[in-house]
């Protein structure tokens, strides 16, 4: 019996593959407006500081393909085909949807490699994909909107924190800062659940790791005229030190799923500069990347959506 093909659309932010691509990438982020030479060189300098280019592109591809392999192992009666769609670099989200159409994919599941829902991220990704699929007559895309409370995601970070605390002598003088990418404050006024979801993720992880000293912060805010969600993790670090005299800071950027510029520079460089100034210890647990435990987490999320689709089809076929 021929297996039914299912498209697995894995979406992520994207990153330049080389320093030569940084300007085009930055221009795309700015909706077609080229950055100033000063802003461009600042961004290039950040990439150089982490070794020349971000590992994100390689990690994202590995995550997508390993997830697809896991799905094929879990659902042997179906054939999952991997399609990678990126927000700001090729292959763009639209490229992936068009490729699915050319390949004859009639049904697809989409997942964004970001756990927390916001109109700026997950909603925007899925809308781009679904809008084009409707325009070109398929495939039908079943989106996964959020997975910030997935137990295996919570367990991953709780385990990382527990391991980190084994390296700290005085746990009562340590604090965990859970962070995500800052977004414009106007999303809060519009009822976006992004902030509440990060707090809930932090509460779940803290409970699972049995830690008392923790808070949430925001990082990597854009350089625009908008007000962005705060406090920024660097300011937060200084405030926490002044108030509690913490000796160890553990940064958990749970809004991200891989090592990339925002983690390797904004956390590992900029936050460490602050902890060094305060003569405090800096810790940042290992990111999920393409570790088997995290791939299993993603597969659990996608398989739940797949079972919903299968159950829906059974109901329709029995009517």
From Swiss-Prot:
GO terms for cellular component: cytoplasm. HAMAP family: Ferrochelatase (MF_00323). SUPFAM superfamilies: Chelatase. Involved in coproporphyrin-dependent heme b biosynthesis. Catalyzes the insertion of ferrous iron into coproporphyrin III to form Fe-coproporphyrin III. The gene is cpfC2. PROSITE patterns: FERROCHELATASE. This is Coproporphyrin III ferrochelatase 2. GO terms for molecular function: ferrochelatase activity; metal ion binding. Its EC number is 4.99.1.9. It catalyses: Fe-coproporphyrin III + 2 H(+) = coproporphyrin III + Fe(2+). InterPro entries: Ferrochelatase (IPR001015), Ferrochelatase_AS (IPR019772), Ferrochelatase_C (IPR033644), Ferrochelatase_N (IPR033659). The keyword Calcium does not apply.
């Amino acid at each position: 019996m021929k297996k039914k093909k299912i498209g697995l659309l894995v979406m992520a932010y994207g990153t330049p593959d080389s320093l030569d691509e940084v300007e085009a990438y930055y221009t795309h982020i700015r909706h077609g407006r080229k950055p100033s030479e000063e802003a461009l060189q600042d961004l290039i300098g950040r990439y150089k500081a982490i070794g020349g280019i971000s590992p994100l592109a390689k990690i994202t591809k590995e995550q997508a393909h390993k997830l697809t392999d896991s799905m094929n192992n879990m659902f042997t009666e179906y054939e999952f085909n991997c399609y990678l769609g990126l927000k700001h670099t090729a292959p763009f989200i639209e490229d992936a949807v068009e490729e699915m159409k050319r390949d004859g994919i009639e049904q697809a599941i989409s997942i964004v490699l970001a756990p927390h829902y916001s109109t700026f991220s997950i909603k925007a990704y899925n809308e781009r994909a679904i809008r084009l699929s409707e325009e070109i007559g398929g495939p039908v895309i079943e989106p996964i909107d959020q997975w910030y409370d997935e137990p295996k995601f919570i367990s991953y970070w709780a385990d990382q924190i527990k391991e980190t605390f084994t390296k700290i002598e005085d746990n009562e003088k340590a604090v965990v800062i859970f962070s995500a990418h800052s977004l414009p404050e106007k999303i809060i006024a519009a009822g976006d659940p992004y902030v509440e979801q990060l707090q809930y993720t932090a509460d779940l992880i803290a409970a699972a790791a049995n830690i008392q000293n923790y808070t949430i912060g925001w990082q990597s805010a854009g350089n625009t005229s908008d007000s962005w969600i705060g406090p920024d993790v660097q300011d937060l670090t200084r405030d926490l030190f002044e108030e509690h005299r913490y000796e160890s800071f553990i940064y958990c950027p749970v809004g991200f799923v891989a090592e990339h510029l925002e983690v390797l520079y904004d956390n590992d460089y900029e936050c460490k500069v602050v902890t060094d100034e305060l003569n405090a210890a800096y810790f940042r647990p290992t990111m999920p990347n393409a570790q088997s435990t995290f791939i299993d987490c993603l597969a659990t999320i996608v398989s739940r959506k797949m079972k919903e689709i299968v159950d829906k089809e059974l109901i329709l076929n029995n009517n």
